[in-house]
């Protein structure tokens, strides 16, 4: 399928549930990273993962990397690129100028360090994006952003790591979403879950 995409034969790549432990080698933390690596051409320096729902979408900035590697990957340029690509997707494909919320990394978006991630990377990125008239806001604390009244204000929430946004998203929407990989010459669209091996072949999945 990816060979077909790399030949320019299509601009949309769709896959069903894939078992990471059976399919991927150890050097790929997720299918998103695998597809990004195998694409011959890239628009973004890093894969952009968008869990899309028409009511609210989320994007983990650092995709599937281990938690102990998150901090060093939160840099201004990566945040700017992530927001730009998602904003362009909404404008060009969905014809919507999205309201985008960006979460902080630390509890309540603060810690005692003068050089924390909010001050060093997140706030400068947001300020630069606002100069381009992109509707981006934050940083917000993850513990309160996902309450009902706040959800009505935004189209997309960008978090700093996977579980920061995927956990509340699936608590609200369960599996009513598509996993879209952006930053490539083609759109890769998938279900937002892997295969349920316990129920496989029993015709019991919803």
PLM regions: where:
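Anion-binding alpha/beta catalytic cores of soluble intermediary-metabolism enzymes, centered on
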Residues: 1-205
């Amino acid at each position: 399928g990816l060979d077909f995409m790399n030949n320019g034969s299509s601009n949309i790549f769709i896959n069903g549930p894939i078992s990471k432990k059976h399919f991927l080698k150890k050097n790929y933390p997720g299918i998103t990273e695998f597809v990004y690596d195998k694409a011959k051409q890239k628009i973004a320096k890093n894969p952009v993962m968008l869990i899309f729902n028409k009511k609210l979408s989320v994007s983990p900035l650092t995709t599937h990397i281990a938690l102990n590697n998150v901090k060093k990957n939160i840099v201004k340029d990566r945040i700017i690129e992530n927001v730009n690509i998602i904003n362009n997707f909404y404008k060009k494909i969905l014809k919507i100028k999205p309201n985008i919320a960006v979460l902080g990394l630390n509890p309540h978006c603060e810690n005692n360090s003068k050089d924390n991630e909010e001050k060093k990377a997140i706030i400068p990125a947001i300020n630069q994006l606002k100069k381009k008239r992109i509707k981006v806001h934050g940083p917000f604390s993850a513990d309160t952003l996902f309450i009902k009244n706040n959800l009505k204000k935004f189209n997309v929430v960008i978090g700093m790591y996977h579980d920061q946004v995927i956990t509340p998203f699936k608590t609200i929407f369960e599996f009513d979403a598509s996993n879209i990989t952006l930053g490539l010459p083609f759109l890769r669209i998938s279900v937002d879950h892997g295969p349920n091996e316990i129920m496989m072949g029993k015709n019991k999945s919803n």
